[in-house]
Amino acid sequence: MKIEKLDKDNVEEYIRDMKLVDTDNLRNNINKLNEFGIKKDDKFVFSFIPYDDFIGVSFGNYKIDDILVKEIFNFLNNNLSFDGHLLVEVYNNKVIDIMDSLYRVKNINVNKIIKDGDDNSSQKEKYADIDMRSIKYFDSKNNIFCNLYSQNIQDDDVIKKLDKFFIENNANSIDFCILPDSLEYMESLGYKCNSKLYIID
């Protein structure tokens, strides 16, 4: 396996190998993206974007199984330095199903759409007072993001009141970053899993 930075010279090969269909944005912005592909047997099978302390990953429409997933993440864990362990954010449900059987989940991003709305404004830091707690969240034209994971909040009653608070304050959409144990309860409130962050060690 080897890592290649995606650029105008290899983007068409990458699109073909990964069986991508919606590619205009990728082609138009390839030189602005900090995206890398992984090649196995001279074919792209995977890509990732590095962030400060994790990578966001994609397998495109390439056929995968648990053997390939383990091989790729073992390779990356040995070749990328993230203080001893690799954190990987996964967005695709099929890949999530495989990852759930292989790795430990650190946190989960969930979302609920209330109504359509514009979210192209800057975020404002705000606080919700729930059960004697001041809970930080960010509001961008009524599109809400609240990191329950970083605030160590997993009490179902607090989460339910917070959800109600956001809806009553005309939220268009609500995004939470949650601890893994909260997923089932969040789904009962109508939230869907957007991504999971896994610990590769």
Kindly label every feature range from the protein language model.
Residues K2-K5, N10, K40-D41, D53-G60, ...:
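Asparagine-rich low-complexity intrinsically disordered tracts
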Residues N28-E71, D129-Q154:
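Conserved donor-binding loop and adjoining core beta-sheet/short helix segment
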Residues N29-K32, N78-F82, S122, F138-S140, ...:
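Flexible, charged surface loops at secondary-structure boundaries
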Residues D65-N78, Q154-E168, S188:
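Conserved acetyl-CoA-binding loop-helix of GNAT-fold acetyltransferases
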Residues N79-Y91, E168-I178:
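Conserved GNAT acetyl-CoA-binding A-motif
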Residues E89-D119, D175-D201:
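Active-site/acyl-donor-binding loops of N-acyltransferases
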